[in-house]
Amino acid sequence: MRGYQRLPLVKGFGRTQRIDNWWNQPIIMAIALGIAMLYTGLRVIMLDGSIHYENHRVTSPIFSPDVLHMFHITNHPGWMNSAMLILWIPFGFRGTCYYMRKVYHRTFFQNPTACMVAKPEINHGVGYSGERGIFIINNIHRYMLYLAIIILSMKYYDVVHTMRFDDSWGFSVGTLILALESFLLTMYVISCHAFRHLFGGSLDQWRGGISSVAGRIFRFSSRHNASHNLWFWTSLAMVFLGDIFVLSVAEGLISDPSFIMG
């Protein structure tokens, strides 16, 4: 049996023998996540006045589902909004996602910064040692999946709701934007490792009946699992693009062209 040889690694934070622009990815991801968290905080806490338009026909993805309006909850503090009640679910699902763990370990904790790139000296002593301590919370990911599916189904209700114009049906640009957001979120959930395990993790074979359906779902999820990072970023970006669109229409900066069927 042949042995192996450990390749030498240049020591010192960020030092490496790599000649590519390895720092681009962690820097871009750190900036993107930083902007996303800052924008969400400002929108939910300070700029929550325009979260829908046309009497709730179209609601911002950040505040969707608008459970306060949906369930006619009016006896609440004036500063409260639906995002404060439901955002912990998508945040909890995304924050414990396997891909997200890779992102924050590389961008914020620098452990490691990138493949074959030296990490900070302090990380050699207190570096990653498994899902222990505060990181044990990552184990709730499989349970957050169920809650995320509920939220996702309610978002499709919002898409249908955008097609209701008084006594008629139709669609608008807002409908298409929320539909695209819901589709991207669906692909992000379906390509998730936890979703894939849900249908194939406890089965050894798929021969017929329910097990054959589970097998097809498992194979579909496995096929898209390789692009899980793509669905992560595109679905996240669409949440904010959708919010900016709704905010712009609600403030009268742009219009929402619609097509109404008789």
Region annotations inferred by a language model:
Residues 1-262:
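Membrane-embedded alpha-helical bundles that constitute the cytochrome b-like, heme-associated redox core
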